[in-house]
């Protein structure tokens, strides 16, 4: 097999692959065997039909097409390895020349695919970053204390109009064109939380128990999702939350402290820690922006456009040109950021240990309220484990860059970020880049060996087979049926 590569743009190449009859022979043999299992020809058992009979009843063209389809991905993967390109997205294949019916002559393929662009990595040592100063106010501590008190509060029924912060029990009926499309009874809702449909807070404001009103809103789910419906709401009861007194007794009930002053002091520390974390988040965002300012990274247009299209389809906003432009800009920046961190991870020889991957997957499962094994199985089914490994590697790359930076607050005080830039694994055994067949429990279990991978989320090619541009021909089994 011979391969040449033509650079179409900084982010796209064309592979010209020439496969000899010898290269194609194993796939020809496989095609005959597979077709023999499919077709029913009088006088022959399934799987025992000889090639000459298949040629006669099905046609040599069907055999060739089957062989090419069977071998195309292998030829493509071999070409990728031979040319050292870094594919992104789904390749598109075109058969330029078929072997002759006598199985002589080469198979000529042209495959276009987006590739990772080359660029010079900007210097990232000693970058200076300025973040907000940390100052905890009494009001912030009071807000945290009130939040804690609310968790220990009790709901008391009141005979007055509902207001923000009250809990109401309501019945809802949605109608479209005079027909009821959805109903719900006995819903408990905190007025002002915004957890239900648009317009519900305004509609409930000032209503008392037993009163009803109507308003219009778009439905968020069900068969009529996205349609505007008339919503009838009836208030069954209004309750307010009665908070416990902020005293020593409350401190002893709600915490390990004996006095309310000790509890307030601890809440102040917790608010401070949260703000320090905010400083680190600020620094992380700044450092990525600074690095991107210093380098030009070409973006694969088709890859970005496909992502934008998927995003807009999910939001049902395909006609919103302003939003399309916003999503495109965001997608392009995300791609550049991913690629930049991928290259830094490679330069720093960062590895992803099994334990690091496990912790990341467990956190992801918690975010989606799923069991870890269930979450991993979903990722495996969608071949997304390598992408998760890439995410962990990029996070580690960002930690390395942040560790090399100088971070100060607005007052010039140095911000200690070492807690968030712990030493990273650099020389571990490699995690498989194709773990999709792994047992789910093994993926999320603690492992004695540290493993790593070079699997950035954008590099999808190993899991993608070339998509043919040519129209599909009739299946071999259909041809056999036509010839009988």
Swiss-Prot record:
Upper lineage: Bacteria, Bacillati, Actinomycetota, Actinomycetes, Micrococcales
Principal EC category: isomerase
InterPro entries with a match to the protein in the record: PPIase_dom_sf (IPR046357), PPIase_FKBP_dom (IPR001179), Trig_fac (IPR005215), Trigger_fac_C (IPR008880), Trigger_fac_C_sf (IPR037041), Trigger_fac_ribosome-bd_bac (IPR008881), Trigger_fac_ribosome-bd_sf (IPR036611), Trigger_fact/SurA_dom_sf (IPR027304)
Record function comment: Involved in protein export. Acts as a chaperone by maintaining the newly synthesized protein in an open conformation. Functions as a peptidyl-prolyl cis-trans isomerase.
Name of the featured protein: Trigger factor
Source species: Clavibacter michiganensis subsp. michiganensis (strain NCPPB 382)
Entry GO CC: cytoplasm
Family: Belongs to the FKBP-type PPIase family. Tig subfamily.
Catalytic activity field: [protein]-peptidylproline (omega=180) = [protein]-peptidylproline (omega=0)
């Amino acid at each position: 097999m011979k391969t040449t590569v033509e650079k179409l743009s900084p982010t796209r190449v064309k592979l010209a692959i020439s496969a000899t009859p010898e290269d194609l022979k194993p796939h020809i043999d496989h095609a005959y065997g597979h077709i023999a299992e499919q077709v029913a020809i009088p006088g022959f058992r399934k799987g025992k039909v000889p090639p000459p009979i298949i040629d006669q009843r099905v046609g040599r063209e069907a055999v060739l097409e089957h062989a090419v389809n069977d071998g195309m991905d292998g030829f493509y993967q071999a070409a990728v390895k031979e040319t050292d390109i870094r594919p992104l997205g789904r390749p598109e294949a075109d058969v330029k020349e078929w072997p002759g019916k006598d199985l002589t002559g080469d198979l000529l393929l042209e495959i276009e695919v987006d590739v990772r662009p080359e660029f010079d990595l900007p210097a990232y040592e000693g970058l200076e970053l300025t973040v907000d100063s940390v100052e905890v106010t009494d009001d912030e501590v009071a807000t945290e204390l009130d939040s804690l008190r609310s968790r220990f509060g009790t709901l008391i029924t009141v005979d007055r109009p509902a207001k923000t912060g009250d809990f109401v029990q309501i019945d809802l009926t949605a109608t479209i064109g005079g027909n009821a499309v959805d109903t719900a009874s006995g819903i408990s809702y905190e007025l002002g939380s915004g957890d239900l449909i648009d317009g519900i807070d305004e509609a409930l404001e000032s209503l008392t128990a037993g009163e009803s009103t109507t308003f219009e809103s778009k439905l968020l789910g069900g068969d009529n999702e996205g349609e505007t419906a008339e919503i009838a709401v009836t208030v069954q009861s209004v309750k307010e939350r009665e908070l416990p007194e902020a005293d020593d007794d409350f401190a002893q009930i709600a915490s390990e402290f004996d006095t309310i002053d000790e509890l307030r002091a601890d809440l102040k520390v917790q608010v401070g820690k949260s703000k320090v974390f905010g400083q680190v988040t600020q620094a992380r965002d700044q450092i990525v922006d600074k690095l991107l300012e210093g380098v030009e990274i070409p973006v694969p247009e088709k890859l970005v456009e496909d992502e934008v299209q998927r995003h807009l389809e999910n939001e049902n906003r395909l006609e919103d040109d302003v939003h399309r432009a916003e999503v495109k800009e965001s997608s392009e920046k995300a791609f550049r950021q991913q690629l930049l961190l991928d290259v830094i991870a490679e330069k720093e020889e960062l590895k992803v240990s099994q334990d690091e991957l496990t912790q990341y997957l467990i956190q992801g499962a918690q975010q989606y309220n799923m069991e870890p094994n269930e979450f991993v199985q979903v990722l495996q089914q969608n071949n997304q484990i390598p992408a998760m490994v890439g995410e962990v590697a990029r996070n580690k790359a960002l930690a390395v860059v942040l560790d090399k930076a100088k971070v100060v607050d607005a007052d010039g005080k140095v911000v200690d970020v070492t807690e968030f830039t712990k030493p990273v694994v650099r020389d571990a055994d490699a995690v498989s880049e194709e773990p999709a067949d792994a047992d789910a429990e093994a993926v999320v279990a603690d492992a004695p060996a540290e493993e790593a991978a070079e699997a950035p989320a954008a590099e999808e090619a190993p899991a993608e087979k070339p998509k043919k541009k040519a129209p599909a021909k009739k299946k071999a089994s259909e041809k056999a049926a036509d010839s009988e």
